[in-house]
Amino acid sequence: MLPTELTLRTTKDGIRLVNVPVKEVESLCKPLRSWKSLSSDEANRHLKEFYDADCLRIKTTIKLSHATDAGFNLFGQRMIGYDMNSNTLNGRFYSPQDPTSMELSADIYIDRTSIEVFIDGGLYSYSMERRPDTNNKEGLHFWGNRIEVKDLQVFSVESIW
């Protein structure tokens, strides 16, 4: 698990607790690729080269225009599942700062055994065990009806061991 910092941030809804990786984590990340304004199919094609990576950082912003739910999987394991109608993220309540924007940003750290996700600048964060479906061949996969991947950045992450 990454070391994180809890801070208070003033939002339009008042003061909120934010959880983000400590700034020193940035020094372990090396930019590999960056794209803007992609369809989910285009983004999925670009991500194929990273299927075998052990450790990655992926920063992305997705926009739901026609979809009511969308997300991002790793070999069938749901890392992000956002349902706009019920305001849930992976089955738990989450409402973005600007619900009318229909956008969700994520900073995702994937290593050999775990996944850590920081949503909308740390306003919502969670971690999970990395347990991909060995029969699933989709790799890193955005899903949702006609979603736009507004921004997609991939970084390698250096090991500290």
Regions found by a protein language model. Name each.
Residues 1-161:
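Beta-rich accessory regions
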